[in-house]
Curated annotation (Swiss-Prot):
This is Diaminopimelate epimerase. GO terms for cellular component: cytosol. Substrate binds at N11, N60, G70, N71, N181, E199, R200, G210, T211. One of its GO terms (biological process) is lysine biosynthetic process via diaminopimelate. InterPro entries: DAP_epimerase_AS (IPR018510), DAP_epimerase_DapF (IPR001653). The record marks H152, E199 as: Could be important to modulate the pK values of the two catalytic cysteine residues.
Amino acid sequence: MVFYKYSGSGNDFLITQSFKKKDFSNLAKQVCHRHEGFGADGLVVVLPSKDYDYEWDFYNSDGSKAGMCGNASRCVGLFAYQHAIAPKEHVFLAGKREISIRIEEPNIIESNLGNYKILDTIPALRCKKFFTNDSVLENILTFYLIDTGVPHLVGFVKNKKLLNSLNTLELRALRHEFNANINIAFIENKETIFLQTYERGVEDFTLACGTGMAAVFIASHIFYNTPKKAILIPKSNESLELSLKNDGIFYKGAVRYIGMSVLGSVFENGCF
């Protein structure tokens, strides 16, 4: 079994093909492990589709499945084109979402996330019990729960330096309380937003999270009146352009092909 490793906005993914749909949860945990496997934020299994150029099953590094991953969608789009699975402009199925891909330059990929849903606005008082003394989150008045394929809780701080002082235990508690990824962001100006994401499945801060960047983008646009196009800068410092077109969210940014790996003794460890 051959795996191709790609990176987008600091997220890295292993991509493989299968002609048969089955549970790859154990395989994902094994191959994504940073010390005992190849190491990646997630596993993408590309599958044939009758109605689309292809479809995928996406697994987080802990083996859990997710319907959508924004940065992985751009990576798999480039993979599909480079391996003659699909043309430069194509559509694939991610869970129940149709994802369109457009390759603008050799490594600049645009993908659409589709529609979003504002699930709730949450007064910070509901979250105070999770904060430690002198928490950097204490000055956040409102959190926003937004579904961009997966649920995200978004809060904005007033000082960029606070993004480097976030408490992992606080964010982990919020993650379990709301069963959502946690995003803390700072709006530097109307078109530039910095953020940090504590991600489900990774259970820690992640270098980037495409759906999290989308949730921050939407929250800033709706509640802070930022424009319909902005640059989002995650922990990796690899920026991503997000835009809103006809109520759909679009990503555009660079994707890198890293290399290829071949599965060996992992079969002996009970992955299947």
